[in-house]
From Swiss-Prot:
The GPI-anchor is attached to the protein in the endoplasmic reticulum and serves to target the protein to the cell surface. There, the glucosamine-inositol phospholipid moiety is cleaved off and the GPI-modified mannoprotein is covalently attached via its lipidless GPI glycan remnant to the 1,6-beta-glucan of the outer cell wall layer. It comes from the Eukaryota. GO terms for cellular component: extracellular region; plasma membrane; side of membrane. The keyword Secreted applies. It is a lipid-anchor; GPI-anchor. This is Putative adhesin. It comes from Komagataella phaffii (strain ATCC 76273 / CBS 7435 / CECT 11047 / NRRL Y-11430 / Wegner 21-1) (Yeast).
Amino acid sequence: MKFAISTLLIILQAAAVFAAFPISDITVVSERTDASTAYLSDWFVVSFVFSTAGSDETIAGDATIEVSIPNELEFVQYPDSVDPSVSEFFTTAGVQVLSTAFDYDSHVLTFTFSDPGQVITDLEGVVFFTLKLSEQFTESASPGQHTFDFETSDQTYSPSVDLVALDRSQPIKLSNAVTGGVEWFVDIPGAFGDITNIDISTVQTPGTFDCSEVKYAVGSSLNEFGDFTPQDRTTFFSNSSSGEWIPITPASGLPVESFECGDGTISLSFAGELADDEVLRVSFLSNLADDVLEVQNVVNVDLTTADSRKRALTSFVLDEPFYRASRTDTAAFEAFAAVPADGDITSTSTAITSVTATVTHTTVTSVCYVCAETPVTVTYTAPVITNPIYYTTKVHVCNVCAETPITYTVTIPCETDEYAPAKPTGTEGEKIVTVITKEGGDKYTKTYEEVTYTKTYPKGGHEDHIVTVKTKEGGEKVTKTYEEVTYTKGPEIVTVVTKEGGEKVTTTYHDVPEVVTVITKEGGEKVTTTYPATYPATYTEGHSAGVPTSASTPPQATYTVSEAQVNLGSKSAVGLLAIVPMLFLAI
């Protein structure tokens, strides 16, 4: 009888080892779109969500979880390269949690925990891999929703993806793994416009090109995904009478006008028009060196129209990367705790202990995008921190605008044991926020000083002005200079051009009165706008632009106020307190 009981226990333990817990969800999205809409050629991010939240179950420190990966998805594995499925995953503080490996015959991905003799009591995180659709699946797939079934011993997860046709209204680049390298396809659709010349050139590559494998084809009878038929690319969609791909050489004739190829560069030109239903595909092969894990060929495509002018969007940089290893993040777990299997709590693995510590009743002025007639008050009270293993609080207020400051209060009570986060420092009422993070026993302090922004708009509106922002952080002083405000003044239109960080933003306002000075200060001071004594009242056709026919007293300023919106989030990161000035223009 004793033997029978032992046998039963062994069977029960084995069943628990391979159960899905603590995997709570499995998701699949396109890496290109970060959504469930994808091309057949896309990389797919497959995420395994681990969570013990709301459960009293624990996990054996050396437990194994097996997940059957659907045959439609596969790891891309090259000969003589590292297996992309083999990896070790850690907490954000560097504590190893588990390792993974994929059996290419059984199509089973195995997660093995790394703490023999321990019991895992707390686990939160996401392990993800990048996979491709199998060639066998793409040969028979149809556009529309497709469901992927991931099976465990006790549960099946079935995320779905909407497979769509290629966008044949613009140039695109696709890639495909081949033995020893990557095959790239640059597709130019005739429907893109009245094109007479196509110039394709590589800008950079980490590998080399096989010039003998540079080929082209022109096709019109595309499949339902808008693609060249994958079963036999050498038979269909070529302008060769034999139906074969034509290698690109100087002697290959029209439509190839010129061709140059070296180890690291390719340049070629095509002359002649494409019909609206035709697609030109140029194929070239990148060889992979043994130590290259990522190939990203940057290709320029320049198009010329029938009137010999370049298109408005002259150059298209097509830079889809191809990887021989999975793009995963080994720091996958935000929370992890394990205790000895005998039940005596003698050690604890701490992933992160962090808290946002602020001066009580700290006032934050936030003005952005949405306006409110009265101040918006947001109060957030964090719970008492009772878990010494992991706690993180992120408080963020955004998309709120007001003429007056937004009052924002954070109160974080702390326990007094050795695991309690650092207490708030500073004096109540100061305009200084101190952030203290306790992570692995280290302490970090950042001090931010209040910032005053001043923007000056000239009366004439033709000079450039400078705005200087000074920020004091950790004792260092940072100065950022922005080139400010140029006006182009017409009868009823003022165009404001702002250059910041090298980017140019243009906003056009109608019926805007001249502005002399606009000064915005944070810390609770109101926005002051000063207008000149007179305004151009009307403009008459036939007069020179910008010359008023009469003047009058300033119009009454009118403000349009919409309902305030508050977005208050809580995530696993250090708290963020943002201070942004708001500039109001009377229109």
